[in-house]
Amino acid sequence: MHTTHIILVNLEYAELNQESEIIHYAENATDVFQHDAFDWRTVQDVIIGSNKPDELLNLLEQCLDTQQQQITQYLKVLNNNLGDSLYQIVSTLSNDNTFTLEFNELAKLLAGEYTFESGFFDIEYCTSRIDKDILQAVKEAPENYALVLFDYHN
């Protein structure tokens, strides 16, 4: 199985200028996730905010939308099958682990744990969770950011 992962690099924070430096930095920062997020990977593209600010913002907004859709989907499954309170959900899961996977995946998304399913990683904040604050910072100064797109295989 393979999927595209988008790695956000703050160029000011890392003091990077060349595309090759950006790729190397993104690889080094995510190497620790080998076997959790990927078995092997290849670079697909590098999008530098000063060159393509609209594309950079568009990809980040797509990541945010995807994450929100995933969270909503897991919540619907849990709500429809286990109830609408955390107490009900945990009580039911204690006796019947049928929906433990969905609960676990939801928790990983909310906690920003980087996995194969995440699709996104922010190196500066060491999180797979993209939120409106990160998006706003990139909107205000896209020239300070780059995205490295990897084809992850698992």
Label each region the model flagged.
Residues 1, 111-154:
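Acidic, proline/glycine-rich low-complexity IDRs
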Residues 1-39, 144-154:
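Short, extreme N-terminal segment that most often corresponds to the first beta-strand
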Residues 24-120:
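Low-complexity, serine/threonine/proline-enriched polar segments
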